[in-house]
Design a protein with these regions (language model features):
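Short, charged, intrinsically disordered terminal tails
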Residues: 68-78
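Amphipathic, hydrophobic secondary-structure cores in small proteins
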Residues: 5, 9-62
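Non-transmembrane, interaction-prone segments in cytosolic or luminal domains
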Residues: 4-6, 75-76
Length: 78
C-alpha cells in the first residue's frame, strides 16, 4: 500500500497529506457521517493535533474514532 498525496487549504495555507487509500476512504466516510467537508474535517484534526505531523494525526484520529464506535457497539450489546 502506497500513500496517496492530496492537497488542501487549511486556515488560509496549502498543505499536503500523504496517507494510504484505506485511510482516505475512511476519512471521506467520516466527513459524510459528520455532514462536513473533507477539508473542514482535516482542518479540525489539524487544530487539535499538537506537534504531530498532520498525516499521522489523521491516522490516529481515525483509529480513535473507530475505537470509540466499537466501544459504543460493545456497550449497546451488553
Amino acid at each position: 500500500m502506497r500513500p496517496e498525496k492530496r492537497s488542501f487549504s487549511i486556515q488560509g495555507h496549502r498543505t499536503s497529506i500523504s496517507i494510504e487509500r484505506a485511510f482516505w476512504l475512511a476519512l471521506k466516510q467520516a466527513a459524510a457521517e459528520d455532514d462536513t467537508t473533507l477539508a473542514d474535517l482535516i482542518s479540525s484534526i489539524d487544530k487539535a493535533r499538537g506537534e504531530a505531523g498532520l498525516s499521522s494525526a489523521v491516522r490516529v484520529w481515525l483509529l480513535k474514532r473507530l475505537q470509540e464506535r466499537a466501544a459504543q457497539v460493545t456497550a449497546n450489546t451488553k
